[in-house]
C-alpha cells in the first residue's frame, strides 16, 4: 500500500502560507529539489499559474525559464541564487535574465536563501524576485 507523497515540513508549509499572502513574487523549493509553489505575483513574471503544472523538479523549472547572465550568456542553474542557496546552503543575490512560459525575456533580480528549521535541518529554499527592466 502506497503512503502517498511525503508530508511537507512545517517551515515549508509556513513559507508557502507567507508566499500566498504576499504581493512580492516568491517561489519555494523543498529539500528534495522540487519546486513546490510559486505565488500569484510570481505568475505574472513566470507567465503561467502554478496550478497549471503543479510541483516539478527545480531543474526542470529552471530549464523552462532559460536562465541567462545579464549579458545573455548561459547561466548554470547551480550558479543561480536558488542554486547557491540549495547547494551551498547560503543566501545569494543576482541580476539575471529569464524567459517566462509566455516567451517574454525579462531582466530580474533574485534573492534566495535556505530555509532552516530550529534543528538546523534545511527544509528548502525561498526565493523572491522582481523585474528590473532593461
Residue positions per predicted region:
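PAS/PAC sensory module
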Residues: 93-95, 104-110, 126
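Terminal output helix/cap of sensory domains in signal transduction proteins
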Residues: 53-100
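Generic structural signal for well-ordered beta-strand positions
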Residues: 36, 75, 106, 122-123
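PAS-family sensory domains
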Residues: 2, 120-132
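Sensory modules in modular signal-transduction proteins
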Residues: 5-34, 40
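Sensory helix hotspots in PAS and closely related PAS-like folds
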Residues: 43-44
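PAS-family sensory domains and close relatives that share small-molecule sensor folds
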Residues: 100-102, 111-117, 128-131
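A glycine-centered beta-loop-beta connector
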Residues: 32-33, 103, 118-121
Amino acid at each position: 500500500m502506497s503512503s502517498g507523497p511525503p508530508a511537507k515540513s512545517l517551515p515549508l508549509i509556513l513559507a508557502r502560507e507567507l508566499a500566498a499572502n504576499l504581493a512580492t513574487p516568491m517561489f519555494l523549493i523543498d529539500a528534495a529539489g522540487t519546486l513546490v509553489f510559486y505565488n500569484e505575483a510570481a505568475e505574472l513574471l513566470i507567465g503561467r499559474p502554478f496550478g497549471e503544472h503543479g510541483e516539478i523538479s527545480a531543474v526542470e523549472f529552471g530549464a523552462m525559464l532559460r536562465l541567462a547572465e545579464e549579458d545573455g550568456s548561459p547561466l548554470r542553474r547551480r550558479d543561480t541564487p536558488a542554486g547557491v542557496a540549495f547547494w551551498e546552503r547560503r543566501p545569494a543575490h543576482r541580476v539575471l535574465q529569464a524567459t517566462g512560459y509566455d516567451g517574454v525575456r525579462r531582466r530580474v533580480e533574485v534573492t534566495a536563501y535556505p530555509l532552516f528549521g530550529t534543528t538546523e535541518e534545511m527544509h528548502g529554499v525561498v526565493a523572491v524576485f522582481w523585474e528590473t527592466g532593461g
